[in-house]
Amino acid sequence: MARYVFITGGVVSSLGKGIASAALGALLQARGYRVRLRKLDPYLNVDPGTMSPYQHGEVFVTDDGAETDLDLGHYERFTGRSANKRDNITTGRIYQNIIEKERRGDYLGATVQVIPHVTDEIKQFVLEGNEEFDFVLCEIGGTVGDIEAMPFLEAIRQLGNELPRGNAVYIHLTLMPWIPAAGELKTKPTQHSVKELRSIGIAPDILLVRADRPVPPEERRKLSLFCNVRESAVIQALDVAHIYDVPMAYHKEGLDSEVLAAFGIDPAPKPRMERWEEVSNRIHNPEGEVTIAIVGKYTGLKDAYKSLNEALTHGGIANRVRVKLDWIESEIFEKEDPAPWLEKVHGILVPGGFGERGSEGKILAAKFARERKVPYFGICFGMQMACIEAARSLAGIEKASSTEFGPTKEPVVGLMTEWLRGNMLEKRTAAGDLGGTMRLGAYEARLQPGSKIAEIYGSEEISERHRHRYEVNIGYREKLEACGLVFAGLSPDGVLPETIEYPDHPWFVGVQYHPELKSRPFEPHPLFASFIAAAVEQSRLV
């Protein structure tokens, strides 16, 4: 039977519960255990798919097409296990399910209430489908005291009583701030956070204390005394240079040992940390450095491109180089010459995005990369803008544009209305709900034999994750290929362009999907490994 670890947060948000959960999952995996991670989000949105990147950060897409919290990306990258739609739930989804049941009459006329109906729905989500796992780690979004989180905290309190004795452990992540005027770390915020948690009925077994400097032994003893946890269970979570240092740091502090001790597992299997040691060594001891310009629309919030950032790091790990990122707002190129911004970089990446804002700047970035022979990687929107650039500059289609920006006589990029998923035909309309108009999840593609991208993958058949409404119009293939832009990858039915490339360019690749979502530190995605390798070659020329 699976054992459950519930991770809550206090004092302030953004302390890193997602990283802590992922790191603990990786440590338990390193000891040979089978681990599943789940995220419970208290917001009322059904999913984050329609939320602004500035509000929520990246939307992480799973193989089965779920739009989820970016923490699921951390879970996948740290553990190597692919998440699915059953690993993320929101208050909005919970209430949607309950209202549907109530309308069907499933509650047989009962008054539908937070307790027991909402809490029962949450508990069902936590418990279902865990038969093949040794540990299930559940991260509760938000902080203790948030009104939105109350049903989730009540549900995990109930689970602590309903599960067999010794099958649930509670970890509380808090902040221990340094007060310069006093010259000391303060325990009071953590004490009050634990007091709030205990008033709900949850007594934490382990305190994970975030701090920017070592926590003195006397302060640990103080937290142990006032928060009623063992002194060994007061674990400092110090700031580290890189997130892939976290598993090693937490292991050194004894987090995984304390969790296993709380479950009464003794003796515990010894962890194998060689892979994490190698990743850390490659990150901190690079043999070179390359600079990649990311020409995007949401560069003001780096979390909007979290998986992209990590995938580029993985590419650096594969090539033993440090990847320096130069974030550039694409609208700048609509006012200024791109050359001064781009002539010193070793690669240009144009990521996904939505809407017309900044699109002309991305087109100019693609043009610069094509003309100057700088490695270019266009992802989703970045591929579409590269095709529009080719249509305008090479094929003489001056009015080439996307129907996403408004009516156009030359729709090089247009709204998809139907496509195949396996043997099923899926249809969407522009008037449909935003959450239901996109091509989401893993789809197969066929790569052209002998193409650069087939060489990179080492295969002519691939499966990648998608998140887009618009697609390059296959009707322009002949004109664009006549200008040298090859449609090297298509959907299995040959209708949807999936990849493009210039054979006479050192490295110019566009993909309609999001390869960054499948990259892992131990298994860098081949496209990112190849892109960074091309940037290394470019660095020798600049």
UniProtKB/Swiss-Prot annotation:
Top-rank taxon: Bacteria
Annotated signal peptide: none
Activity regulation annotation text: Allosterically activated by GTP, when glutamine is the substrate; GTP has no effect on the reaction when ammonia is the substrate. The allosteric effector GTP functions by stabilizing the protein conformation that binds the tetrahedral intermediate(s) formed during glutamine hydrolysis. Inhibited by the product CTP, via allosteric rather than competitive inhibition.
EC number(s) recorded for this UniProt protein: 6.3.4.2
Positions of CTP binding: 13, 146-148, 186-191, 222
Residues of the active site: 380 (nucleophile), 514, 516
GO CC term (a single one): cytosol
Binding-site positions, ATP: 14-19, 71
Residues annotated to bind L-glutamine: 54, 353, 381-384, 404, 469
InterPro entries in alphabetical order: Class_I_gatase-like, CTP_synthase, CTP_synthase_N, GATASE, GATase1_CTP_Synthase, P-loop_NTPase
Binding site for Mg(2+): 71, 139
Record's catalysed reaction(s): UTP + L-glutamine + ATP + H2O = CTP + L-glutamate + ADP + phosphate + 2 H(+); L-glutamine + H2O = L-glutamate + NH4(+); UTP + NH4(+) + ATP = CTP + ADP + phosphate + 2 H(+)
Other known facts: CTPSs have evolved a hybrid strategy for distinguishing between UTP and CTP. The overlapping regions of the product feedback inhibitory and substrate sites recognize a common feature in both compounds, the triphosphate moiety. To differentiate isosteric substrate and product pyrimidine rings, an additional pocket far from the expected kinase/ligase catalytic site, specifically recognizes the cytosine and ribose portions of the product inhibitor.
NCBIfam families, sorted: PRK05380.1, PyrG
Subunit and interaction comment: Homotetramer.
Name the record gives this protein: CTP synthase
